[in-house]
Amino acid sequence: GYRLVHSSYEHLNHKEILALAKILLESRALEPVELHGILDKLIAECPPEERSIIEGIIKSETFYYVPLKHGKKLLNRLWDLSLAIRGQEILHIRYTRMDGIHREHLVKPVAILFSEYYFYLVSFKEEESEYPTIFRVDRIEEMEKTGKTFQIPYANRFKDGEFRKRVQFMYPGPLRRVKFTYSGPSVEAVLDRLPTAQILEEKDGVYTITAEAYGIGIDMWLGSQGDRVKILKN
């Protein structure tokens, strides 16, 4: 027999559009032309009365929006990288490091992540490496397809969600387990910053916590907490 399946397309509502607009503005990830183009299209989804309310709410933030210093448009680059990831294409990139030195790399791109203002390309170098290398997308000066592809068995596919939970400040490196105590005012902030963190015990307001993380980024964050953190096992 036949079964009638009801299908409907729901537009974003004004509350969802406001939330997305706030996230875009706060991220500072896009240069003004790209940002305003997205905001205009989002707000255009609203009925006129709600449209004017949202425009009023974000008017000041939009006017005083301060883009990042690199000033580069990123939407095309993000799309091209995403297609290369999907097609498992080996890329040749020309990259400018933080110190201004240019380097060329053959990479196997596996994911794009966003963290604290910047988009990052996660990839493996053409020569086999144990853990991925991270490149800031705005520092990729040139990108070319090599015409070659790479294969990753399904069981070994890169899981960007799992990686994201274990990398801090986009510093790559080997996977480590860190154990520390925390005596600050908000253990919730620690759990939010370190998604793999687990509380082992709590005594007199001091929490013993363990977390998994790649690289040295976690050391930088723990060090920034001052005497509220004491590292037990590193």
Enumerate the predicted regions with their spans:
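Minor-groove-contacting beta-hairpin "wing" of winged helix-turn-helix DNA-binding domains
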Residues: 1-6
